[in-house]
């Protein structure tokens, strides 16, 4: 259905360089204005990988896009910011600082939130996106008309009919009392709410799982400067939190990024629905996006 506005893109170029979370290597991202109808896509070594659920593959602790042997990891925070800030069309050029990594690159983590991307988008601004002939396109949005849900290993993700975008998210970490059980519900969900309540929430982990994750080759670039760490016995190791329920809010940030992969041809990625998730993760988010995609 029509949203009542035309598709948008960036008013200028954005360039940011930083360390990645899992590989620990440095990469540079350049965001370029895109043509109307192109949507969001990555350009890695002249290989185009659309930011689409069709190219999402399961990977530990992040969302990865794969096409023709090339992989781009930890795309969720960047895509979350682009979706929430209504950047419908964008060319995302990304490159490694290490020339030996010719088939894999990871988006920088910065402080573990989407704040760096949101600030950059606000600084450069937005403009109406047009195609190569100068024509603008209507921004469309999918509406959920019948409930859909998926369950997996005690987790659930669902989408219910709603006149507006709403998100309800719950998490449970009984092994870490400082986190415990948290729930966040937003109505309605829009760019203003995202900027003030979601974008600055940082990724988090349990201290007792750090060694295990590093033995698996993960979070090599992780530290107290790019995430919040909670100990089961000692609580938060690098307070203060930005919100009392910052872990739950970060899960919403991830969800927006993962559901943005539902977008097609510059349309809205988040479907107009009440999205409800409990104990979710990137794989479950992607499964919900695939289920929604298969229903249209």
Language-model regions, residue ranges each:
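Short acidic-hydrophobic catalytic motif
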Residues: 1-296
